[in-house]
Amino acid sequence: MKALLHKILYRTLPLEGYLRAVSRLFFISYRLGLGRRSAATEYVYHLPRLAKAGDTAIDIGANLGYYARPLSEIVGTAGRVHAVEPVPVVRRVLRRNLRGCRNVEIFDCALGAENKEITMSNDSARETGYLGTGRNFVGDAAGEGAVTFTARMRRGSELFAGLERLDFVK
């Protein structure tokens, strides 16, 4: 049923609208406590055991904010969340999903071994019929029907050189 809904949304909405709808459904499910036994979403429910108030966290590949938003609530006003998301359309939805999370900073890059422009691709629609969020990869070998994005890659050691502490990395 979930896959059918994803296919319908992906085929009828523009990409950003699809991502907004999918993320809205996730956050509703999360608030209701659904998905605890789903392989795709179970880990977000473990965050309160891994992070605490006042922590500094980095969310690498923040995607639509499925971890950054709960982390923002957990670390509270004394903590900080650094969300790294290189894909522009995904980052726009991430910003929307993190409205009001004053302790989150969003970085518009991927993390890697060097500072350079990269191509990221997602060819999950070929296999599933819809774009699987969180399935973007770096490389020029995108298959037929792949969605591609240009992004910046930055060295994490440089990007986060000024952090005084780091308590949690996803």
Language-model-derived ranges and their functions:
Residues M1-K170:
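Phosphate/nucleotide-binding beta-alpha loop and adjacent structural elements of enzyme active sites
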